[in-house]
Amino acid sequence: MKEKLHPAYQKARIVCVCGAQFEVGSTKKEMRVDICSKCHPFYTGMQRTVETRGRADKFRRKYGLGK
């Protein structure tokens, strides 16, 4: 590696809009994010599942298609 070519790698603080803060390594000192693992529905278990069977049946009825 060449000297003085690469940016300085330091500890960075990640701040989420929900208030959670994390420390990671980065070339920036601070970053702000809209969503993190503390507030994302997938990680919190509050996710919703979409019922696709009803949509498929509606499509088949609309266009007269059989299963």
Curated annotation (Swiss-Prot):
Bound cofactor: record note: Binds 1 zinc ion per subunit.
InterPro entries: Ribosomal_bL28/bL31-like_sf (IPR034704), Ribosomal_bL31 (IPR002150), Ribosomal_bL31_A (IPR027491), Ribosomal_bL31_sf (IPR042105)
Cross-referenced Pfam families: Ribosomal_L31
Coiled-coil regions, chain positions: none
Highest taxon of source: Bacteria
Named cofactor requirement(s): Zn(2+)
UniProt binding sites for Zn(2+): C16, C18, C36, C39
GO cellular component: ribonucleoprotein complex; ribosome
Protein role: Binds the 23S rRNA.
Protein name: Large ribosomal subunit protein bL31
Organism: Desulforudis audaxviator (strain MP104C)
Gene: rpmE
